[in-house]
Amino acid sequence: MRTIITFVLYLSIIIGNENLDIGFRYGFLSKLTYNSHINTILSDSSIIHSGNYLRINIGYLTESNVHVIYKSAIGDYLLLDFKEAPSNNQKATQQDTTYYTALNWTDIEPPAGTETFYFINTFEPLTKLAELFKKYDRAPVKGQKKLAIRIQDAINFYDPDIQADLSSLSSQLEKPVTGGVAFRGEDDGINDLSVTHECKGKDGIAFKKIILIHK
């Protein structure tokens, strides 16, 4: 009887979470040199050059999970950062938001090509992806090629362009914000901690894919 009750409670949490709105804010920024104080907002199909510096800021629901994944121009995968919901998950309806930097200023290196970034935000744990990346990081080159296919398949599971029953909508914020508060310290409002866009999903999944054209 206790097992049945526990299982029912678990299902109630999962179903309840899926019915909640889910979404995150992000800021994908670039600058020409590390010492530059001029930040540029990046979006899908933006052009970057070798030597440019990139930064990613994320604001997400504290009771959710986030994976930020990078696929290089030569097809290598890297889990840039991930955040897991607290284990003592109490009330996902509180809508508390956590802001953090998923990628600090990092220069983009050759070769040129398409640089792909995936932002995945879910209420359910991203356990499969996390385990695949652990194996990928330890595997030899030949093994990584096989695991890369499995990683992409796992990513595609959350991609609304591939899964017809999913939907995510991204839009630019009217004003850049820092930690959830409008920032007025600079003329253009864009500082190192700014988030500039919002992605809203449904059924417990929000997904954003950004491809940068590296020249």
What is the meaning of each model-derived region?
Residues 3-16:
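Sec-dependent N-terminal signal peptides
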Residues 17-55, 59, 65, 69-215:
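Secretory-pathway glycoprotein ectodomains that are cysteine- and/or Ser/Thr/Pro-rich
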